[in-house]
Amino acid sequence: MLITIFTPTYNRAELLPRLHKSLQEQTNKNFEWIVVDDGSTDNTKEVIENIILQQENDFPIRYFYKENGGKHTAINRGVREANGDLFFIVDSDDILTFNSVELISIFYNQIRDKKSFCGVSGMRGDFESNKIGTKVTFDILDCTIAESGYKYHIHGDKAEIIRTSIMKEFPFPEYNDENFCPEALVWNRISKRYKIRYFNKIIYLCKYLEGGLSYQQAKLLEKNKKATMLTYKEIVESVEKPILFRIRSAINFWRYTLLYSFFLGKKYRLKWYWIILLPLGLFARCLKG
């Protein structure tokens, strides 16, 4: 099987049929759909059971329920259950273009035997099919996920499809007292060893929330300090990245975690000389709230 299309969901029962419809419309059905329910209290289970029993599906659908732990823990569960060569995270409130799997197959076959690649990535668009993020002119681009931002200045979410074996190699850390982990932590780790092939085709449609998402993300980063510290610490220590990029990450480290890292072990601490940026982190915290 080529792809595991994976959907983590939490109280989004009413949106799952729309996503399912976009999967039914795929021109290439070489995929399975795994839904991991992260502790929903609505009728998600009944909706999925109805889809499995009453709809005509020419692709496998599997549903798993777990206690609420956050999207990253649902991803870890999905990776463990996946049968596809590739792992594609598709959120419950989003859909795929009709030729998404077909395009993934075409571009993945170009790099399938190249072990230096972790996978491929298409573009995201809004529901009017306008591209989200930086407008790019390339047809294909080979670089790491991290390089796409700091080297090629490509910003905005993309639609990454990663080899399942590599997702298993780089699971999200899980903490009992936290329910969020930035995906950047895993992408940065993957970037240290693998490239990805970007192709300039929209394969993923979602609602673009300008402003609101960044505010919510900031609150999550502040609340889930261990995962946040680990993410920014590893970026700061990535010597291959430009120094200004690392400085900005160090400022964000202090902005979201204050002095909390001093109460934990070395795993979460920056080297002593980065404390010079603590005042800028506090200033950013006061400025942005």
Give the residues covered by each predicted segment.
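Short beta-strand/loop segment that forms part of the nucleotide-sugar
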Residues: F31-G39, R62-K66, S92
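Short, well-formed alpha-helical segments that are part of the catalytic scaffolds
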Residues: R12-E25
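Conserved donor NDP-sugar-binding/catalytic core segment of glycosyltransferases
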Residues: N99-T134
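Short aromatic/hydrophobic "clamp" motif used to bind/position activated sugar donors
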Residues: F87
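Glycine-rich, basic loop-to-helix element that forms the pyrophosphate-binding segment
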Residues: K66-A82
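Catalytic core of nucleotide-sugar-dependent glycosyltransferases
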Residues: I202-L209, Q216-K241
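Conserved nucleotide-sugar donor-binding catalytic segment
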Residues: D126, N130-Y215
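A conserved acidic beta->alpha catalytic loop
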Residues: S22, D37-I48, D91
